[in-house]
Regions:
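Long, contiguous binding/interaction regions
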Residues: 132-136
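Short, highly charged C-terminal tails/helix-capping segments
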Residues: 146-161
Length: 161
């Protein structure tokens, strides 16, 4: 609470990586979603069908957060990076959460949001509702994004691009 003296005792984590990974797995199973899981990078990959394009979603569980990452199959040309970044900024300022970004190394556009679970108690319903909002946001803006960058087939790994 604001104004209260902070305790010098470290807070115990409510959740750990293994329990959150299992919660994500349970959530996907309850929703009967097809997914792949990588033990090496501790991430789940799911493909949703948007209005006109598939939406690849990766849920990456680390020691503090669940990262929702969608690497879009859209690539900007180097000479358009400045314009694309400006347009992405315009989209981002209207979003309630998350951000679209341009990778300057390869020109690919992605959308990402991280949920810090350390002091929270997320549920199956929360994971599924959050994923629905995440996918809905990507789907809502993919038309604008297709006007900024060209479509390519380049699905990337959530951890290593």
């Amino acid at each position: 609470m604001f104004g209260r003296r902070k305790s010098t005792e470290p807070k115990a984590m409510k959740q750990d990586t293994d329990s959150i990974t299992e919660l994500v797995r349970r959530s996907l199973d309850v929703a009967e979603l097809k997914y792949t899981y990588s033990n090496a990078t501790n991430h789940f990959s799911i493909v949703f069908m948007g209005d006109d394009l598939p939406i690849n979603v990766n849920l990456v569980v680390d020691d503090l957060t669940i990262r929702f990452v969608s690497h879009l199959d859209l690539k900007a040309k180097p000479e358009k990076y400045k314009d694309v970044a400006w347009e992405l900024n315009g989209i981002n300022k209207r979003l309630r959460f998350g951000a679209f970004y341009l990778d300057p190394d390869d020109g690919m556009i992605s959308f990402e949001y991280s949920f810090p679970y350390v002091e929270a108690n997320p549920s199956t319903d929360f994971i599924l509702a959050f994923m629905k909002m995440f996918v809905g946001t990507v789907d809502e803006h993919d038309g604008d994004l297709k006007n900024l960058a060209e479509s390519v087939s380049a699905s990337r790994n959530a951890m290593y691009g």
